[in-house]
Amino acid sequence: MTFLQRLQGLADNKICAFAWFVVRRFDEERVPQAAASMTFTTLLALVPVLTVMVAVASIFPVFDRWSDSFVSFVNQTIVPQGADMVFDYINAFREQANRLTAIGSVMLVVTSLMLIRTIDNTFNRIWRVNSQRPWMMQFLVYWALLTFGPLSLGVGISFMVGSVQDAALASGAPQWSGALRTAATLTFMTLLLWGLYRFVPNRFVPARQAFVGALATAFCLETARSLFTWYMGNFDGYRSIYGAFAAVPFFLLWLNLLWTLVLGGAVLTSSLSYWRGEAFRRGFDSRGRFDDVLKILLLLDAAQKEGKALPVQEFRRHINMGYDELGELLEKLARHGYIYSGRQGWVLKTGADSIELNELFKLFVYRPLPVERDHVNQAVDAVMTPCLQTLNMTLAEFDAQAKKQQQS
């Protein structure tokens, strides 16, 4: 077997082809650049976020020990072993921030909300979301993350750590407490990432796909943290170069790696919807887009006749495409008044006998220029005009014609 034949065999393999699809999306979404931007934003907003979160927790004395668990969790996750000095500085800055005036406190809250908004925008870009949540809904979500987020984390971490210690003591093998603690941290990190991937994007994300992406990312994060700690413990040549500041560049490198893995997990999660029906092999070109639009409208027309709405996942049972591509088409059809989103799902706004195929073709494939055109534009219009005239039929007429051809 030649080398080219082996490459062709890899391309035909479903797992290899899907892995290459994820790598391409990782590059298309410019994850390394986004991770670098998130690193800088985190560096600026980390102290304000911790200050606001701990300040909210301190309002309720019963949550004091849980807020300490949250801070310890942040220390273990964000600051790798060997860069502990950085977290000492962060704690010192946080204590100084507690002495700020009212205006300074407001700026802390604003800076914290900016970090969460940056995360929200980055996730929505990965899921290719065009329509953002209403600003009031965004504010409520961001504020809930700042207030209830650390409390939930603290409660969960305290519960898990206590359970691990009890299990180790009950088994008579306290030496297993380290492994059990790692398993508990991995479990909790998976749940945290699952919540991010499932609810942060303004797009439907199946719970199972969010869990797979979160589990893979949590394993990568734990492995990276172990390797990072091992390197810093066994190769200390960097200390002779940076001296007392050695922890700072490694802290920045770790933050960058952390965000690269988290955003890479988001790319993986958003790509999992392409696995079914090998949708990752097809190209999302104008022809495919037009065909998918017709399928969407025909499904909605059939649902309308039965008096029901269609949830997003129902479309995926009939059309092989990812949820982000599907969401783009649904949002565009909604913007142009063909469909709308109700509580139960998507609904056709008008009847199939009122939808013209040539208008859909102009919307999704080719639209003649309304302004003054040169000879090339005029020649293209002359070629396309017969095509548009051929499409001068309604969706109902097209459906009847398609069924007739299927029967013959």
Curated annotation (Swiss-Prot):
It is a multi-pass membrane protein. It is found in: Cell inner membrane. InterPro entries: UPF0761_bac, Virul_fac_BrkB. Keywords: Cell inner membrane, Cell membrane, Membrane, Transmembrane, Transmembrane helix. GO terms for cellular component: plasma membrane. The keyword Cell inner membrane applies. The chain crosses the membrane at residues 43-63, 100-120, 139-159, 176-196, 210-230, 248-268. Signal peptide: none annotated. The keyword Cell membrane applies. It holds the Pfam family Virul_fac_BrkB. Belongs to the UPF0761 family. PANTHER family: INNER MEMBRANE PROTEIN YHJD (PTHR30213), UPF0761 MEMBRANE PROTEIN YIHY (PTHR30213:SF0). This is UPF0761 membrane protein NMC0462. It comes from Neisseria meningitidis serogroup C / serotype 2a (strain ATCC 700532 / DSM 15464 / FAM18).
